[in-house]
Regions:
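Short, intrinsically disordered terminal tails adjacent to the first/last structured region
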Residues: 127, 138-139
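Catalytic histidine-centered segment of alpha/beta-hydrolase-like enzymes
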Residues: 113-126
């Protein structure tokens, strides 16, 4: 994340060689077969839009520039957290942090899933979400 604090350099490296770094990152951090060549072409087309890469990187820049801005109170509404244990970007301990931030939360682990849980386990994710949204909340 410190790398993203530099001006322009992250954008140049991410965009170089037809967004090779971005495509490799998707492939390295997901289960085999998650991203097809067609998927990668679509990502490259999206990344090529003016300002897209800077917008993505600015999220990480803001974490360091405005650290106090991201404080959130307790989450009081029913919450279901879905988490891939093999997430290369978000350490599994953050799932517990998120869970403790909620007064009524359920944490569901996906042992073989990565950061791309919704792409790797779409049926299970959809089932978990439909079940959650179909259940009336209790006060």
């Amino acid at each position: 994340m410190f790398f993203f604090q530099m001006p322009r350099v992250p954008e140049l490296l991410f965009s170089a060689w037809n967004f090779r770094a971005g495509a490799r990152s998707l492939l390295r951090t997901s289960r085999a077969g998650t991203f097809t060549p067609e998927d990668l072409s679509r990502y490259r087309a999206a990344w090529a839009q003016p300002g897209a890469v800077t917008a993505m990187i600015n999220w990480y820049r803001a974490l360091f520039r405005y650290p106090g801005s991201f404080r959130v109170g307790r989450i009081e509404v029913p919450t279901r957290i879905l988490w891939g244990r093999k997430d290369a970007f978000l350490h599994s301990s953050l799932a517990g942090v998120s869970h403790r931030q909620c007064t009524r939360a359920e944490l569901i682990w996906f042992d073989q899933a990565t950061h791309w849980l919704h792409l790797e386990e779409p049926e299970a994710v959809n089932s978990a979400l439909i079940g959650f949204f179909s259940t009336p909340a209790t006060p």
